[in-house]
Amino acid sequence: MAGKGEGPAIGIDLGTTYSCVGVWQHDRVEIIANDQGNRTTPSYVAFTDSERLIGDAAKNQVAMNPVNTVFDAKRLIGRRFSDASVQSDRQLWPFTIISGTAEKPMIVVEYKGEEKQFAAEEISSMVLIKMREIAEAFLGTTVKNAVVTVPAYFNDSQRQATKDAGVIAGLNVLRIINEPTAAAIAYGLDKKATSVGEKNVLIFDLGGGTFDVSLLTIEEGIFEVKATAGDTHLGGEDFDNRMVNHFVQEFKRKNKQDITGQPRALRRLRTACERAKRTLSSTAQTTIEIDSLYGGADFYSPITRARFEEMNMDLFRKCMEPVEKCLRDAKMDKSTVHEIVLVGGSTRIPKVQQLLQDFFNGKELCKSINPDEAVAYGAAVQAAILSGEGNEKVQDLLLLDVTPLSLGLETAGGVMTTLIQRNTTIPTKKEQVFSTYSDNQPGVLIQVFEGERARTKDNNLLGKFELSGIPPAPRGVPQITVCFDIDANGILNVSAEDKTTGKKNKITITNDKGRLSKEDIEKMVQEAEKYKSEDEEHKKKVEAKNALENYAYNMRNTIRDEKIGEKLPAADKKKVEDSIEEAIQWLDGNQLGEADEFEDKMKELESVCNPIIAKMYQGGAGGEAGGPGASGMDEDEAPPASGGAGPKIEEVD
């Protein structure tokens, strides 16, 4: 990398339900599989009485531990506790959310027997750490730099909070880019060789939790976002919920029992529903089977694709509204759309594809990129460009992103005066001159809002600051220049200057919205380090325990082998057997011991067994296998069998 020596830069798709990571390598993007072999990793973090789990391990144990397994952090990030969406989500989540300082939603869990509170940024940072580790394991080097994606619909505070999550995870976030833009890059590279002239591309991204539609034009490597629309709260989980509710009612009918207050039963049902939904994308019917779902009653129920579609028809239809809005905003007719690109796992649902295709009068949909991986793919390309790693294939791609919402300030009477219209290409800068509203007014309050409504009270206040010390003058005389400046990450700086005195004041739109302060972030970075070392301690402990267990059982099998057993003097054999038995007993009683305890026990056991085994080899084995005895053994291998002729012992795990 151009002189920075920080290893390759990665692209991370930080999703509501699943995340994905990619890297530019050998002139192409590699989507990296995790330790379970999956190319997407659940955005789940679980806390137990002994450890912290992230990804598949967390999702797999969720039925046993629903209250301490956190997911959907992306639905909380950068929001206030009182937001309507946070309040409605709270009803559905098994974990507890409370209001922290400045109305910041905090997630409450029990970890190692203590109550802990986490901000959404911290949970997201844990998922980011996991994604970074997946990349590091694949690349064999440390990774510092990353491009992270967010929905096009994310507002300023949600973007800032996502960037903060990256900082807590110890990443240098090169840039935050919009998911549809990332998908378009993936698609654009895919098609680059063949296309000439301007292409209008509609990205239809229906993921686990959010829904985004974007219209872009791609011309000679320049991507320009023309319009975006969507629903921050529509996705695969909503389709699962419909199915869950349907089966809850059915269970009630059949068994006269209501499982709505039973997190574990609900979780098992939800997992089965998610699986059924995926199956129904490729088959017309499937069956939900759950043994003793609740109160000893088994649950067994068929579901057809038609029934699933009917349950969700209103939601599927709702997916078409943002498509129309996007075309209207871009002032484009649907006949002028060249390509429709599907992104997000939920676009595999045949009905969604059919409705979309019908809307575009039967036009073929582009399915050449894997919908789960497109966003991470594009992010990886962007990371390669920003870190100067990519080859000429990518270096001439240029990304022009847009602001999703109009930005402006409040003028007399609560009117929203817009300086930057939504769908303006960023980075951008806009100045306008304002004045005072009353005679001899000593200062002005600059209040910055985002939104499309005419009155500021209907829009979202981003932040405010005071410009004081204006010399007394009649109203309308002082000249105050206000400048709005948006950088490439979509982060806004607002400044105001009094022309006569040259007095200036400015604000970077950050902390007014429950954003983390620098101290908070530093504290969280330290905590993240602490959790990481705890995780490593735990791993060491488990490895030491397993090594001891393997050694004990292998040794036991070795001396039970007749060919070897008969070569041992009875006293030695008994000595070995007793010490193994003692070690196994000790293990059963000390499953939660510390690593060094297991290591000490191992040394103790080896000091008894190894000399006896070595003596036996020197004495009875004849020839080549003498010498070092079993102490050089790998922890997983059984001691070698008798010297030259005898058969080798199979490893028993």
Curated annotation (Swiss-Prot):
InterPro entries documented for this protein: ATPase_NBD, Heat_shock_70_CS, HSP70_C_sf, HSP70_peptide-bd_sf, Hsp_70_fam
Compartments (UniProt record): Cytoplasm; Cytoplasm, Cytosol; Nucleus
Phenotype of null mutants: No visible phenotype, under normal growth conditions.
Tissue: Expressed in cotyledons, leaves, stems, vascular bundles, roots, stigmas and anthers.
UniProtKB keywords: ATP-binding, Chaperone, Cytoplasm, Nucleotide-binding, Nucleus, Stress response, Transcription, Transcription regulation
Classification via PROSITE patterns: HSP70_1, HSP70_2, HSP70_3
Major location (coarse): cytoplasm
One GO CC term, this protein: Golgi apparatus
Matches recorded under SUPFAM superfamilies: Actin-like ATPase domain (SSF53067), Heat shock protein 70kD (HSP70), C-terminal subdomain (SSF100934), Heat shock protein 70kD (HSP70), peptide-binding domain (SSF100920)
Inducing stimuli: Induced by heat shock and cold. Up-regulated by viral infection. Induced by infection with the bacterial pathogen Pseudomonas syringae. Induced by cytokinin.
Composition bias, Gly residues: 619-630
Pfam families per UniProt: HSP70
Coiled coil (residue ranges): none
Entry superkingdom: Eukaryota
GO biological process annotation, one example: response to virus
Region (Disordered): 617-653
Recorded GO MF terms: ATP binding; ATP-dependent protein folding chaperone
Task of the protein: In cooperation with other chaperones, Hsp70s are key components that facilitate folding of de novo synthesized proteins, assist translocation of precursor proteins into organelles, and are responsible for degradation of damaged protein under stress conditions.
UniProt similarity note: Belongs to the heat shock protein 70 (TC 1.A.33) family. DnaK subfamily.
Name recorded for this polypeptide: Heat shock 70 kDa protein 2
This protein's encoding gene: HSP70-2
